[in-house]
């Protein structure tokens, strides 16, 4: 079940690096290669940015739209997979700048849904003993998506295969996600008991049945709910300890974005091609591989009392500052 859920943030990562390795065959003179699209750097930048725009729109509207449509976590991730499939098929069959930008916008909508719904889905399914490790799989799926897109793009460019192989891979992943989602995946029991019941579409009996199917005992989840913090009302403010933690996380995330990491993931091939024209795609591939390696340790350390979330976060922030 967890493997199916994390396919959604995989699309987010895939979209980030989807065009990176392809810049060489998109921004060029048509006479240099038959695969060249003849795009300008501004057009390539627009196509890249449309993914971010779509992600911003979807992340802001996902929660209220889901409540309005009585849609649970499963339905939202199925919508994400549908958008990913449409976007990938459109990108695979077009060569015009407008349609490429439209495909990227749709893919961004998928990514926006994924980054909102996936952490909640994992949190509501994870047993308390490994909740931190399960939550880390969200970020691992993102960096795996980034690496896969860079790998497929580098392979297509260096071996002179059609660049359409890159969106075709994401289309295949989306198709698998849809099939498994409709045939096997189940709704989040936490959502059924919480928002689902409030909206009149869920029940405790259905949640218990799903947990039984997943091999989870009710006693485990009773202890989880007993440990969870109370839900605040619309006019209530979070405790001061919450506010301090939220500020720390927000500042760290903003610092991560201002460090320029996204510029590397989106444009490393174009940046490095001016210095290492023949090795630029491989440098980008190495960067994404290191990203995966550094995401693996928290899987084991985040629930370890000797490390925990705070020390890992401080280590990450310190590393960014030193770099």
Show the residue positions of the predicted features.
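Charge-rich, low-complexity intrinsically disordered segments
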Residues: 216-220
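Intrinsically disordered, low-complexity cytosolic terminal tails
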Residues: 221-225, 231
């Amino acid at each position: 079940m967890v493997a199916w859920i994390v396919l959604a943030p995989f699309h987010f990562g895939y979209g980030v690096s989807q065009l990176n390795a392809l810049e060489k065959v998109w921004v060029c003179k048509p006479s240099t290669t038959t695969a060249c699209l003849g795009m300008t750097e501004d057009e390539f930048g627009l196509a890249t940015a449309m993914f971010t725009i779509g992600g911003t729109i979807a992340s802001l509207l996902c929660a209220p739209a889901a409540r309005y449509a009585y849609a649970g976590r499963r339905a939202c991730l199925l919508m994400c997979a549908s958008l990913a499939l449409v976007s990938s098929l459109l990108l695979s069959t077009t060569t015009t700048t407008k349609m490429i930008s439209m495909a990227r916008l749709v893919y961004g909508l998928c990514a926006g849904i994924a980054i909102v719904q996936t952490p909640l889905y994992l949190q509501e399914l994870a047993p308390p003993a490994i909740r931190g490790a399960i939550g880390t799989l969200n970020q691992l799926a993102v960096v795996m998506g980034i690496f896969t897109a860079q790998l497929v793009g580098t392979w297509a460019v260096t071996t002179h295969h059609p660049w359409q192989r890159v969106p075709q891979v994401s289309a295949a992943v989306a198709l698998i996600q849809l099939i498994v989602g409709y045939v096997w995946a189940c709704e989040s029991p936490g959502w059924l008991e919480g928002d689902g019941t409030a909206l009149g579409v869920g029940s405790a009996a259905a949640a218990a049945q799903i947990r039984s199917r997943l091999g989870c005992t009710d006693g485990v989840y009773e202890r989880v709910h007993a440990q969870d913090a109370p839900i605040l009302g619309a006019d209530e403010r979070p405790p001061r300890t919450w506010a301090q933690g939220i500020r720390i996380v927000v500042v760290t995330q903003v610092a991560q974005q201002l460090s320029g990491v996204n510029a590397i993931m989106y444009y490393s091939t174009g940046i490095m091609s001016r210095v290492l024209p023949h090795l630029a795609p491989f440098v980008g591939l190495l960067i994404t591989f290191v990203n995966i390696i550094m995401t693996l340790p928290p899987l084991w350390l985040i629930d370890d009392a000797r490390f925990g979330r705070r020390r890992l976060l401080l280590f990450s922030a310190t590393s960014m500052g030193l770099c």
